[in-house]
């Protein structure tokens, strides 16, 4: 039997509605079929879009190794001798046709970090624009712009470091609008009892993009040269943009091929949750404690996420001393686990709500706790098992995999508390959550001057502590119902 959607709730206050599951006495509407539906087509295309997005984001970190003259970085070699080198280096035919640049470690840091300085700027504007004109064009142009800029990366590198830094910042500007725009679109497309499934499918593309692009970029660098890394992913992004603009619509009402039944199902499920206000209630938004609960959780989660995303290959190489081929595969493995976990958790979260009558806030709290405390435990464990290579890789993989639970927790709570302003809210939380990407790796580098296991234990413990704090704060102050300021009639509504 297909899942049922609860109908409109009464005008209970927010406190009571926060813990109320599906109402047995409420009018229920049968869910539209999943197969060949417009909403799941949107989720799949969004999945492909975020796959491309993260491939465009992380490909430079791999290509940079091949772009830099190895003689420039010999003095920066900080490989630890605490752990034995457990495998002989593998000699692979290497194509040397790509140009080399004499960039020291500091210059490379600026090149890699410049992305976030653009990324942080367009978060809130992206959410606001998407709430006004729709997310389809904004998200499409964001990925298209990033793809085009990526094609010019080899030229920018030839023109100099400053040009390349500016180009990467421009790519960040383009990518900065994408997540808020996607959230804004789902506010019109995702029925409340399918939010976890639909959003985790779409955003899981980011994890798989990381999994595929890391080793693929390395293969391209070895057997062709680094310039083709940017050409390949740039062209794929342009092809995706054409499909996106052709197939997708901003709302069910404007979709050309959606069935009448599916359109009615989506519209009726959201009719009591969306606001008709023309003015954004900025004051109420910024004073909302449930929003700040998401901000703290998002910031805390991203601290460990970005620390591992940027430094895991370094830890694998300099502490565990894996060779470059093993490093590429093992660094991607945790993100495959996270991708799989996100997909399964989206299904599980909505199943708990529909079949077991779990309230929205209960589901969000449970999945946030598992997705933040679990990774913290295994991250600390990875730092304290020394040179046990198998356990180190296993613990780091489990840590990142468990982070996938959070995708059905705080990550989509914006749509629970204010669906009409979900893009703006995500822009706000992602602005704060980008700060760890700018500062976390720098702090981690400063804490590991001698590159010892004890120093890395400190890095992992700090990340774990921040994760646990964020999980506790979210559990205490998060809400699961639409807030009164997010409704035009200012009456809270059960979600």
Swiss-Prot record:
Its main location: membrane. A motif (Dileucine internalization motif) lies at residues 22-23. Glycans are attached at residues 71, 77, 95. Keywords: Amino-acid transport, Cell membrane, Cytoplasmic vesicle, Glycoprotein, Lysosome, Membrane, Symport, Synapse, Transmembrane, Transmembrane helix, Transport. Residues 63-109, 158, 222-227, 300-328, 387-391, 445-457 are lumenal. Residues 1-41, 131-136, 180-200, 249-278, 350-365, 413-423, 479-495 are cytoplasmic. Residues 1-25 are annotated as: Disordered. Expressed in hippocampal neurons (at protein level). GO terms for molecular function: D-glucuronate transmembrane transporter activity; sialic acid transmembrane transporter activity; symporter activity. It is found in: Basolateral cell membrane; Cytoplasmic vesicle, Secretory vesicle, Synaptic vesicle membrane; Lysosome membrane. One of its GO terms (cellular component) is lysosomal membrane. One of its GO terms (biological process) is response to bacterium. It is a multi-pass membrane protein. The chain crosses the membrane at residues 42-62, 110-130, 137-157, 159-179, 201-221, 228-248, 279-299, 329-349, 366-386, 392-412, 424-444, 458-478. Changing residue 183 to R: Abolishes sialic acid transporter activity. Does not affect L-aspartate and L-glutamate transporter activity. PANTHER family: SIALIN, SOLUTE CARRIER FAMILY 17. Belongs to the major facilitator superfamily. Sodium/anion cotransporter family. This is Sialin. The lineage of its organism: Eukaryota, Metazoa, Chordata, Craniata, Vertebrata.
């Amino acid at each position: 039997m297909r899942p049922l959607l609860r109908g409109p709730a009464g005008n209970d206050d927010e406190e009571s509605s926060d813990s109320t599951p599906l109402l047995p006495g409420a009018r229920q509407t049968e869910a539209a079929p999943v197969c060949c539906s417009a909403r799941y087509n949107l989720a799949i295309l969004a999945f492909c879009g975020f796959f491309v997005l993260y491939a465009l984001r992380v490909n430079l970190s791999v290509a940079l190794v091949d772009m830099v003259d190895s003689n420039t970085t010999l003095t920066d070699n900080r490989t630890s001798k605490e752990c034995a080198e457990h495998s002989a280096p593998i000699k692979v035919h290497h194509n040397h046709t790509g140009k080399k640049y004499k960039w020291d470690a500091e210059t490379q840091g600026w090149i890699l970090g410049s992305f976030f300085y653009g990324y942080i700027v367009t978060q809130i504007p992206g959410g606001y624009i998407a709430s006004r004109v729709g997310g389809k064009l904004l998200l499409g142009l964001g990925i298209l712009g990033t793809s085009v800029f990526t094609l010019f990366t080899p030229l920018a590198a030839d023109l100099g470091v400053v040009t390349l830094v500016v180009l990467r910042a421009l790519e960040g500007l383009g990518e900065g609008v994408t997540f808020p725009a996607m959230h804004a679109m789902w506010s019109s497309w995702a029925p409340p009892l399918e939010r976890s499934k639909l959003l985790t499918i779409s955003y899981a593309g980011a994890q798989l993009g990381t999994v595929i692009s890391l080793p693929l970029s390395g293969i391209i660098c070895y057997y062709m040269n680094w310039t083709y890394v940017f050409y390949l992913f740039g062209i794929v992004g342009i092809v995706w943009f054409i499909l996106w603009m052709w197939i997708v619509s901003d709302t069910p009402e404007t979709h050309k091929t959606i069935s009448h039944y599916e359109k009615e199902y989506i519209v009726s499920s959201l009719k009591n949750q969306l606001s008709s206000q023309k003015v954004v209630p900025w004051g109420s938004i910024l004073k909302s404690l449930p929003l700040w609960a998401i901000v703290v959780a998002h910031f805390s989660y991203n601290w460990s996420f970005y620390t591992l995303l940027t430094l895991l290959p370094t830890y694998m190489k300099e502490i565990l001393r894996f060779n470059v081929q093993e490093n590429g595969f093992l660094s991607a493995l945790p993100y495959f686990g996270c991708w799989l976990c996100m997909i399964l958790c989206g299904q599980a979260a909505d199943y708990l709500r529909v079949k077991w009558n779990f309230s929205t806030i209960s589901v969000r709290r449970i999945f946030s706790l598992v997705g933040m405390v679990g990774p913290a435990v295994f991250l600390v464990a990875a730092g304290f098992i020394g040179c046990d290579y198998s356990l180190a890789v296993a613990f780091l993989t489990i840590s990142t995999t468990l982070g996938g639970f959070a995708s059905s927790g705080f990550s989509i709570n914006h749509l629970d508390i204010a669906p009409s302003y979900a893009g703006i809210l995500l822009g706000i939380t992602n602005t704060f959550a980008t700060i760890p990407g700018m500062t976390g790796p720098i702090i981690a580098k400063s804490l590991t001057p001698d590159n010892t296991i004890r120093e890395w234990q400190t890095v992992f413990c700090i990340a774990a502590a921040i994760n646990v704090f964020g999980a506790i704060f979210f559990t205490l102050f998060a809400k699961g119902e639409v807030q009164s300021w997010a409704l035009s009639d200012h009456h809270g509504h059960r979600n």
